[in-house]
UniProtKB/Swiss-Prot annotation:
InterPro entries referenced in this protein's UniProt entry, alphabetically: FliE
Annotated Pfam families: FliE (PF02049)
Claim: Cytoplasm is one of the keywords in the record: no
Family note: Belongs to the FliE family.
Keywords tagged on the record: Bacterial flagellum
Gene: fliE
Localization annotation: Bacterial flagellum basal body
Predominant cellular place of this UniProt entry's protein: other
GO MF terms held by the record: cytoskeletal motor activity; structural molecule activity
Protein name from the UniProt record: Flagellar hook-basal body complex protein FliE
Gene Ontology, cellular component aspect: bacterial-type flagellum basal body
GO BP field: bacterial-type flagellum-dependent cell motility
Length: 109
């Protein structure tokens, strides 16, 4: 059940980050700050994180299938669902980006 506790902690961390982001508006500047990551970097990191989540889920499922001790079915299912949800979220982000690109391309100049 340690994965359940880990999931709850992850959700609490995400909510805390969301509240921090919403509470402190940042000034808009024309130049990018030194050391600040671009949107492309953030998107690349998100893709890598989803790939790592899927790989970890696959490894856990394989360990369960071969009967490795200490691997519980609930852990496998939770890991699989995490990978699925993260992939679906990434797919939605991609769809929104494609739609935004198409909208911009259809704008009259």
């Amino acid at each position: 059940m340690s994965k359940g506790v880990e999931f709850n902690r992850l959700m609490l961390d995400m909510r805390a980050m969301q509240m921090d982001a919403m509470s402190a508006p940042k000034p808009v500047s024309g130049a990018q700050e030194a050391g600040a990551s671009s949107f492309a970097d953030m998107l690349g990191q998100a893709v890598n994180k989803v790939a790592q989540t899927q790989q970890a889920s696959s490894q856990l499922a394989n360990a369960f299938e071969i009967g490795k001790s200490g691997v519980d079915l609930t852990d496998v299912m939770i890991s699989s669902q995490k990978a699925s949800v993260s992939f679906q979220a990434l797919t939605q982000v991609r769809n929104k980006l494609v739609q935004a690109y198409q909208d911009i391309m259809q704008m009259p100049v």
